Amino acid sequence: MASELLPPPPPLPKLPSTTTMATITTTLSADGSAATTIITTTSNAITASTTSTATTISSLSDDDLREIFLRLPDLPALVRAALTCRSWLGAVRSNPAFRRLFRALHPAPPIGFFLDLTGPTNPLFVPLRPSDSDAIAALRRGDFFLTSLPHSFCGWSVTDCRDGYILLWNGMNNLGGNDMSLATLNPMTWAVDILPLPGPGGIEAGSSNNFAVLGFHLQCSDEKPGVFRVICVCTDQNMVRAVIFSSETRDWVIQPWVDIGENNSLKFRAGSLVDGSVYWPCHGKGRMVRINIGTLDTSVVDLPGQVEVDGYNFKAGETKDGKLCIVYQSGLSLDVWIRSMDGEGAEIWAPQSTHNLSAEIDRITHAGHLHGYIKMVQVRYGYVYLSKTCMTLAGMQHSWFFSLSLETLKLELLHEGKYDGYVHLYVMAFPPSLVADDGSTGHDAEGSH
C-alpha cells in the first residue's frame, strides 16, 4: 500500500530570549587607587520567528503533477512515481487524456518477441533488452514461458500481440472443431481466457469449397483493462467476411460476405491492424482490403503504382503519431508512404522516404556474400521491424532481426540467431493499477511492480 507524504512541518513557536547587558564603571579614590564597579542588567524579551510560505511537493495540484509526469522518460518511471503516494496515483488514474498523451510521447519499446516454432510446441520468447533492469524484472515475474496455457497436442501458435496481451490458437485447420482453441494470455498477470468458438457451420455459411480462415487480430481497450475484441478474417474466392468476438458479451458476431471483385489473392497471416481497421494486401496486386471494425464497412484501397505485393515484401502499419502508412521492400530498398489528404479532401498516398538497406545490413551482418531474403515483420509506433535470413557456408540457417526508425532512418540490430518463422513483438501495457475505468481515483489501489 503506497504511503502518504508527510505534511509540511508546523512553523517554529515564538521562544523567549534573555538579553544581558553589563555596565563597567571605574573610579579613583583619594589615595590614588582605582575601584571598578560592574552593574549587570538582565531583561527577558519575546523574539518572534520569521515564517515564509514555501511551495512544497505536497502543495502541487494534480495538473502540476501531470505536467511533471509527462517529463518522465518511460512507463516504468511513471509507475514508480505514481505508486509513491495516493494523491500521485489519483492524478494519473483520474485523467484519461493524460494517459493518452503519455502513451503518444513515450511509446513503450518492445521488450521481446515470440517466435513460432515448427512442431507441437509452444512459441519461444526472445528478450530484446537484456540490460534494461525494468524489462528484466518484468520478465522474471511474468509467464513468458506460457506455462499457464492448457496443454495442447498440436501446440499453441501466436497470432497477435497487443497492449500486453497475446492471442493464440491451435488446431487452425479445423475452425469450430473439437481440436480448435483460441486463448488470450496476459503474461504479466498470468491471466488466461479460453474463448468460446463460433457455432458449427456458422462461420462458413454461404461459402464454397474455397473457404479459408486468413488469421486473427486482437483489439484491446486502453481505458478498460481486460476488455478486448478478436477479429477473424475469412475468405472464399472473391469474397471476405469478418467474424468478431467481444469479451464483454462473450459472443461472436458473423458479418455477411462482401464481394471484393476478384478471385482470392489474400494470403495467410498477412494482415495488419491499424487504428481500428484491418488491412489485408492482395497478393500479386496493387491494392489491399480494409475492414473497419467500428463501422463494419469493407472496402478496397488502391496502392501506389510501383507496389506489387509478393510474399513478405509489404506491410501496412502506423507512424509515431498514429497515421496509416505502408512500407514496400524491393530488393534491399524500402519505400514508405503515408496516407494523407490532397487539396480537394481526397485520400492519397504521400511518398515519405526511400531507404537503401544494402550497405547498412552488410556492415552489421558481414554476410553480404551469402544468399538470403528479407521479411517484413511489422510496422508499429513509427518503426519498421524486419528480418534477414541467410544460409551459411556450413549449411546452417542464420537470421538477424532489425528495427528501422521511420523518423531518423536509423537501422538497429535487435537480435541474431538460428531461427526463422513468424515473429510477434511484445510491448508492455499500462498496468491496470494506473487506469480507473469506474471513475474512481484509485486511492485504495495497491502498489506493485
Across the structure, where does each feature detected by a protein language model lie?
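N-terminal entry/capping and adjacent linker segments that precede and initiate structured domains
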Residues: 1-449
